[in-house]
Amino acid sequence: MRRSLVTALALLLGTVAGRAACAQTLHQPKVAPGPREPDWDVVLKTRYGLSMFGDLLNPVKTTPQSTPALFRKAGPGPVTYRPVIALGLETVNRGGWYLPGSDVKSPDKHELWSYKFKNTTEDLAKNTNLPPPLAEGSSVSFAPPDQPFGLWISNDGLKDGGVFSQPQVVAAVNERLAKQPYKAMIYPNRDLATGRLVPHSYIIGWEYSTNDDFQDVVCQVDNVELVE
């Protein structure tokens, strides 16, 4: 009986510890439900088999500015970066990459693509209209120099500086969001069918508003490594 109790207690403690490991950190911004849209945790679980906090690669442990936020090219060939789900504003969305400037207020931005589209809950349920159609002249690949770079998105309807993978750049460039600059949640890309991680591939949930549902634009970036 005593051994059974010890075993049961060990299992319980292991379960609690596992749940704690996957829990939201103390300083992590809260993620809001999607307004009449799929919630971010549901998107991650159903499309990638990912845990919203358990698989998060840039959790806020102390300050947003201390989180991993830059990438480096992983191998031969171009880097690809494109939106895969569009749940934000239907005004024109833009995205691209940047090199950190001499100061945080001066990122060297390069635009790659734009689109004016919004997916529906039905699109995600039926896997239709995915990825969103890009505007003419858009590109999803680029050849960065051999140094760390960041990613960004923006929306024309907001008329601000956009949001960046580095929170400190958001705080410096975007006055509207300066007090809540953590706007990108970064994850490994997992193939749902096999359960295996896709090498050098990441999923990013972007937020460019203040409600922090983190699925305004969901992007995939390939042939990169996250700089820790």
Residue ranges of model-derived segments:
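Extracellular distal adhesion/interaction modules in secreted or cell-surface proteins
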Residues: 24-199, 205, 215
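C-terminal segment of classical bacterial N-terminal signal peptides
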Residues: 14-20
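Initiator methionine at the very start of the polypeptide chain
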Residues: 1, 23-24
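Bacterial N-terminal signal peptides that target proteins for export
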Residues: 1-7
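Small-side-chain structural scaffolding
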Residues: 10, 21-23
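Long, compositionally biased interface segments
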Residues: 197-228
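Hydrophobic helical h-region of N-terminal Sec-dependent signal peptides
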Residues: 7-14
